[in-house]
A protein has these predicted regions:
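Auxiliary Fe-S-binding modules of radical SAM enzymes
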Residues: 1-96, 251-259, 265-359
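Short polar/acidic secondary-structure junctions
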Residues: 70, 83-85, 101-103, 152, ...
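Short linear Ser/Thr-Pro motifs
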Residues: 70-71, 112-113, 199, 222
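Generic beta-strand structural signal
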Residues: 76, 96, 107-111, 119, ...
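Residue-level structural signal for beta-strand termini and adjacent loop
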Residues: 100-101, 175
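Canonical Radical SAM [4Fe-4S] cluster-binding loop centered on the CxxxCxxC motif
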Residues: 102-146
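Conserved AdoMet/S-adenosylmethionine-binding subsite of the radical SAM
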Residues: 148-328
């Protein structure tokens, strides 16, 4: 029985099945997710006899930090190795990336939800990997727990988590939500929903499904284009879920009184960064309610795109504000340590394939 990734209810039921009191499941749940204790022998709230039995019948499988890359901006990028295992058939071994980003008042952890990705966004390094496999709930939660434990002596009061690493979270919906229920449970990892953000390329059925979850992370949309023609080229998923459908789903998505839907827009020099693009984005945002736009200048890598000029960034930002669209310019952390999602896994995999750029 693999314990990491199991809910409190699952642990309680399993312990009852072993003939133990259900509250032993609560103790294991607390040890895993609040105390970050991954050694059954050190779970001293459990009787010694039970610990010995669990040592024979249970496992706690953690990703292996194959590499750590330390950026001059203080962020740490992890390349985690995931072992093969059994879950509805054989799971392939894989590598995924997570980033720990400290700031003055908080730390933000960016995590992956799939190894590789099938969505095939043309500007994304992860697309070159293809989809290797979905991550389990335990593998997703571990990307939060391990950096928190490693940096426990210097943690700030607030932890933010963004599901913006490798993979499309809404194409691994059940495992992602199983992980999020643990992360957002006050008796689990204990993060507030307002501090956790799920980013999607625009999987409309997944957005509609997420909207029905009683406790859920905030929603972010990876927009990156100002019209369907442009988005079809940059993000082929748009051919299946065009902007009209995507924005309609966003309009219906429930948000709290202080909650925004975030639209992320990667600025690609000479591709989607013109003043007319900015005006079109402002029109797309009209009537959607509480939204904000994060402008993300392209992070240089091996793909055939270039950074936007500072003038283009400033003009795009200015036009959005002029049109009453809340907008922020966000520069990638860890740019000096292969910070684009997928770069580390690709480097480990070997030579990179060529990708057709948008001309």
């Amino acid at each position: 029985m693999e314990l990491l990734g199991k809910s409190r209810e699952e642990l309680r039921e399993w312990l009852k099945g072993l003939g133990e009191p259900a509250y032993r499941g609560d103790q294991i749940y607390r040890a895993l997710y609040q105390e970050r204790n991954f050694d059954l022998a050190r779970m001293t709230t459990l009787p010694g006899e039970l610990r010995e039995r669990l040592g024979r019948e249970a496992t706690i499988t953690l990703p292996t930090a194959r590499q750590r890359y330390f950026s001059k901006d203080g962020s740490v990028r992890y390349l985690f190795g995931l072992p093969a295992g059994e879950q509805k058939g054989m799971m392939k071994p894989a590598s995924v990336e997570a980033v720990f980003m400290p700031s003055e008042a908080r730390q933000t952890i960016c995590i992956s939800t799939q190894a590789g990705c099938a969505v095939d966004c043309q500007f994304c390094m992860t697309a070159q990997l293809g989809l290797i496999r979905n991550l389990t709930a335990g593998e997703i939660v571990a990307q939060i727990l391990l950096p928190l434990e490693e940096h426990k002596e210097e943690l700030r009061p607030q932890t933010n988590v963004v599901l913006m690493g490798q993979g499309e979270p809404l194409l691994n919906f059940e495992n992602v939500m199983a992980a999020m229920r643990i992360v957002l449970d006050p008796k689990g990892v204990g993060l507030a929903p307002k501090h956790v953000t799920l980013s999607t390329s625009g999987i409309v059925p997944g957005i509609e499904k997420l909207a029905k979850e009683p406790v859920r992370p905030k929603l972010a949309i990876s927009l990156n284009a100002s019209c369907d023609e442009q988005r079809d080229l940059l993000m082929p998923i748009n051919k299946k879920y065009p902007l009209k459908e995507l924005l309609a789903a966003c309009k219906k998505f429930p948000t709290g009184s202080r909650e925004y839907i975030t639209f992320e827009y990667v600025l690609l020099g000479g591709v989607n960064d013109t003043a007319e693009d900015a005006r079109r984005v402002a029109r797309l945002m009209s009537g959607l309610g509480r939204v904000k736009v994060n402008l993300i200048p392209w992070n240089p890598g091996s793909l055939p795109y270039k950074e936007p000029t500072e003038e283009a960034i400033a003009e795009f930002h200015r036009i959005l504000l002029e049109k009453d669209v809340p907008a922020f310019t966000r520069y990638s952390r860890g740019r000096d340590v292969m910070a684009a999602c997928g770069q580390l896994a690709l480097a480990e995999k070997g030579p990179q394939s060529s990708v057709i750029g948008i001309q």
